């Protein structure tokens, strides 16, 4: 169990991560590119539903099927450099989505992977504040509209692969704008986040008895 100073430092870092999607104030960098695993790709950019500029990759395959990938917090389209000391504290290991994209490509899927607002190379939205899906759903809508209007993807069979923050964002988007999902044939949502449970378990792990109340005051 950490001492009081260590617990407070961990708590402060957790609040910053939760509210801004950054680690110690830094966005996670994009360390890898699809060509590292032998994939051709193109850089793409398109607007969110509310106009925030989003950047990503389009990885083409010889098929009429498309997967749109929505990443987790505090990662990006590449994954997360948790193996680097300055981005540690989340398990200490790297998350690398590129082998996953390679497997999807080899299975016959085109892939659209992009950075959610305030992550990666995408623009800042809402003053840099993270909404755990309540704001980022607009980016999911933006990606759907982009895929629906892009000449080579508009007639493709479309599937969503959404992780953590991406899953929450997808769920909120689907709830608010179900008509935007008319062309979605399947959806995989990995680890959608229940905010209260995560906060309660975190403050318990650092021995902060009044941690949930402190967290609630810190973010409101």
For each of these PLM feature ranges, what is it?
Residues 25-66:
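N-terminal cap/lid segment of alpha/beta-hydrolase-fold proteins
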Residues 61-107, 111-113:
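Short, surface-exposed "cap/lid" segments of acyl-processing enzymes
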Residues 162-172:
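Glycine-rich nucleophile elbow surrounding the catalytic serine of serine-hydrolase chemistry
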Residues 96-100, 129-151:
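Alpha/beta-hydrolase active-site loop
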Residues 73, 115-119, 193:
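Short beta-to-alpha linker loops that shape the active-site pocket of alpha/beta-hydrolase fold enzymes
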Residues 1-36:
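N-terminal targeting or regulatory segments adjacent to alpha/beta-hydrolase or S9 domains
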Residues 152-164:
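Alpha/beta-hydrolase fold nucleophile elbow
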Residues 172-220:
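Hydrolase active-site cap/lid region
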């Amino acid at each position: 169990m950490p001492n009081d100073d260590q617990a407070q430092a961990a708590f402060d870092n957790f609040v910053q991560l939760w509210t801004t999607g950054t680690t110690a104030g830094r966005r996670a960098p994009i360390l890898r590119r699809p060509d590292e695993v032998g994939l051709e790709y193109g850089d793409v950019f398109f607007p969110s539903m509310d106009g925030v500029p989003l950047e990503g990759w389009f990885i083409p395959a010889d098929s009429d099927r498309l997967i749109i990938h929505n990443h987790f917090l505090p990662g990006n389209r590449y994954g997360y450099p948790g193996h680097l000391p300055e981005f540690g504290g989340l398990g200490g290991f790297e998350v690398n989505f590129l082998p996953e994209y390679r497997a999807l490509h080899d299975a016959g899927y085109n892939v659209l992977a992009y950075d959610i607002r305030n992550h990666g190379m995408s623009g800042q939205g809402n003053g840099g504040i993270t909404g755990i899906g309540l704001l980022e759903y607009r980016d999911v809508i933006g990606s759907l509209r982009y895929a629906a209007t892009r000449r080579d993807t508009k007639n493709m069979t479309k599937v969503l692969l959404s992780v953590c923050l991406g899953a929450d964002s997808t769920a909120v988007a689907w709830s608010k704008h179900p008509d935007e999902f008319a062309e979605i044939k399947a959806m995989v949502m990995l680890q959608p986040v229940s905010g209260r449970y995560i906060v309660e378990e975190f403050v318990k792990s650092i021995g902060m008895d009044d941690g949930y109340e402190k967290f609630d005051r810190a973010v409101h």
